[in-house]
């Protein structure tokens, strides 16, 4: 589920608008893409379809975010969902 903010299963992200995906992380989601996780500090810095961010701000293809910033533990998606 999406940490502190919003809906964890599609629709709403963390304080902002996401398109059928998970918007996780610290702060608002800035344009969470189509069926992807917007992870990291500020949430939504890794644009692209059906991909998840890597560590921090980075990009990643079909990989979950690590701990600290982004999905994993603490901020964002605690269980590391991928759809």
UniProtKB/Swiss-Prot annotation:
Domain of life of the organism encoding this protein: Eukaryota
RPT repeats: 9-15, 19-25, 44-55, 56-67
Coiled-coil boundaries: none
Alphabetical keyword list: Keratin, Repeat
Record-level GO BP terms: keratinization
Record-annotated disulphide pairs: none
A single GO cellular-component term on record: intermediate filament
PANTHER family cross-referenced by the UniProt entry: KERATIN-ASSOCIATED PROTEIN 6-1, KERATIN-ASSOCIATED PROTEIN 6-3
Family in the record: Belongs to the KRTAP type 6 family.
The protein's role, per its UniProt record: In the wool cortex, wool keratin intermediate filaments are embedded in an interfilamentous matrix, consisting of hair keratin-associated proteins (KRTAP), which are essential for the formation of a rigid and resistant wool shaft through their extensive disulfide bond cross-linking with abundant cysteine residues of wool keratins. The matrix proteins include the high-sulfur and high-glycine-tyrosine keratins.
Subunit structure: Interacts with wool keratins.
Protein name in UniProt: Keratin-associated protein 6-1
Organism of provenance: Ovis aries
């Amino acid at each position: 589920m999406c940490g502190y903010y919003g809906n964890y299963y599609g629709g709403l992200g963390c304080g902002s608008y996401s398109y059928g995906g998970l918007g996780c992380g610290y702060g608002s989601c800035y344009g969470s893409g189509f069926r992807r996780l917007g992870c990291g500090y500020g949430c939504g810095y890794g644009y692209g379809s059906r991909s998840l961010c890597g560590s921090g701000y980075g990009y990643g293809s079909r990989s979950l975010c690590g701990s600290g910033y982004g999905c994993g533990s603490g901020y964002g998606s605690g269980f590391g969902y991928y759809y």
